[in-house]
Amino acid sequence: MTDLGVVFPAGPDGRRSTAALGRAVVADALRPVDPAGAGAAERETNWRAGYLPHFRRLVEAGIASREAELTIADAGLASLHRRMRVAGPDGAETALGDLVAAPAGRVLGAAEVVGTGEPERELSLPFRGQRLRGDALLRRLDTWVENGIVEPSAAEAVRTVVAHPEWLALPGTTVVVLGAGAEMGPLTALLRWGARVAGIDLPRTQLWERVLDTARRGAGTLLYPVAGEDVGADLITEVPAVADWLTGLPGHLVLGDYVYADGATNVRVSTAVDALTVRLAAARNDVALAFLATPTDVFAVPPDAVAQSV
């Protein structure tokens, strides 16, 4: 693990323990609502294998009320932001919160690719080698609901977009795709619909060749950061530079989080996105947030979904 940029806090022995951080943050999140649960998390001796019951308890404690839910989220985020650190190239460490006002290490310029394709004016979904649209898509949604494949609310959301194809291009909006090269990200679909997208990803040549090729074949506009001949930016080490670049983009901003990395690096980059969000929200009053949920988390299942499944 490279000790540069957003890093885990070091313990008394100098080690940056992911387990110690996870245990402490979950305990801090539970403490205002479920002190007993907080104590159980703190006493967990094998966090790497035993964290699941404590994450389940986070959800259970939040179900009681909206206030409890928000209190847990606020306490957990505050704990994470208070504990995580930022390591500079000189070895000095500062608080994560200092990134809100920290100067950028470099200034990022903006390059642009305008797609050559015709924008799609109708929502379609890939299915068994084809694309479902129109009545065929609506019938398939009904079948999926009847067979318990999707929840009724998910099908209704798709039907709403089908009924409003003018939404697809998101006029007047710039969608920031953090993790532009992510396979599960929306970059390809947005560009196919004719939207304006700002893509952020690591400065890797092959990655950007693929992203730029997608943009050329699409029907939208891709904005991306450059510095000289370098394309892209590393969120873990460049939150101020990326935030300054995003602050100057046109249109209403949707900040979409689709970043992913293996192991501890995923926590570091996700925390960097949090810091970026705080800084950007302080600089602009028109920022909306979007993210991709994970099926590996713990969720409270709504009553209509339970009723539909039995």
Please identify what each model-predicted range represents:
Residues 265-268, 272-310:
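Long, charge-rich C-terminal accessory regions
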Residues 1-61:
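Non-catalytic protein-protein interaction scaffold segments in large eukaryotic complex-forming proteins
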Residues 1-2, 208-249:
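Extended charged low-complexity segments that act as oligomerization/scaffolding linkers
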Residues 152-171:
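A short, basic/flexible loop-to-alpha-helix module at the beginning of a structural domain
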Residues 239-282:
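Active-site/ligand-binding-proximal alpha/beta "capping" segment
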Residues 39-154:
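Low-complexity, highly charged intrinsically disordered N-terminal segments
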Residues 199-204:
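Conserved acidic E/D residue at the C-terminus of a beta-strand in Rossmann-like folds
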